[in-house]
Amino acid sequence: MTNYTGYLQLSTEKKRGKTIAQDMYFYGAFKLMNPFYLNNDEQACFYIMNPGGGYVDGDTYRMDIHLAKEAQLLLTTQSASKIYKTPKNPVVQEINITLKEGSLLEYLPDPIIGYKNSRYKQKTIVHMEKGTSLIATDIITSGWDPKGNLFSYHMLDLNTKVYLEDNLILLDHIRLTPGSQSLSSIGQFEEYSHLGTMIVVSEYTDESLISMLYDVMETQNLKCRYGLSMLSKPGFMLRVLASSTQEVMRAFDICHKLIRMKWYKRSPVFLGKY
């Protein structure tokens, strides 16, 4: 096995009406907290921690997440992913997710913060069987600079592939290189600083849901730009441009709340972060 800076493996299964950890293993700069259950629900919730506090030059990370039949998992992080300067090699993170029949994964990580002169590459591959559901988000901020400048990182590269029954149904590649792109120009970020992406794949998705989401979002006085797009298979993608993490999260929360109530009769998730 490759010697990663941080490695995490989590396999879950449904047993006696609750989702439990069938197998859990981690080492290095990754750690999993013990699961908890919101409102005594069957869905297991886990926090991923990075005890090191941030990602540095040449770090490599890998997560392998597996949900057995009818398992339900909410996976989040304890804090933002801080990418410090990388003078030689980029930070690389691989995320591999497998969802078996009838399972549900809500993957809600904190924002990515690229510090000045940092480089980060993330590759996410999701394999879904029929009847599974995925809700996954990513937030990219304008980064951190000691002088307060925006977009002073070298590169943020996020590549996501989702397969349903071994067929590629979504390929999303975001590559931001401020040195060669004018990210504040027309057609880019313009006056905004944060980019949010929510991916939802589920056979429960239909056009009436998209219309409902648009209707609700239009009443919320959101201070952002957003767009919803249907996928080739039942599912959608939400893109958000905003000026803060909080505004991106407001848009995400509206969609997430409606989906949880409509599909699973569950109350909204409040993780107490933003």
Swiss-Prot record:
A GO term from the CC aspect: cytoplasm
The coiled-coil regions, if any, are: none
Assembly, per entry: UreD, UreF and UreG form a complex that acts as a GTP-hydrolysis-dependent molecular chaperone, activating the urease apoprotein by helping to assemble the nickel containing metallocenter of UreC. The UreE protein probably delivers the nickel.
The molecular function GO annotations come to: nickel cation binding
The UniProt family comment states:
Belongs to the UreD family.
UniProt-annotated location(s)? Cytoplasm
* Alphabetically ordered keywords of this record: Chaperone, Cytoplasm, Nickel insertion
Q: What does this protein do?
A: Required for maturation of urease via the functional incorporation of the urease nickel metallocenter.
> Which InterPro entries is this protein grouped with?
UreD
The question of whether Chaperone is a record keyword is answered with: yes
Q: Which Pfam families does this chain map to?
A: UreD
Which species?
A: Lachnoclostridium phytofermentans (strain ATCC 700394 / DSM 18823 / ISDg)
The main location is cytoplasm
- Gene that codes for this? ureD
Its recorded name reads Urease accessory protein UreD
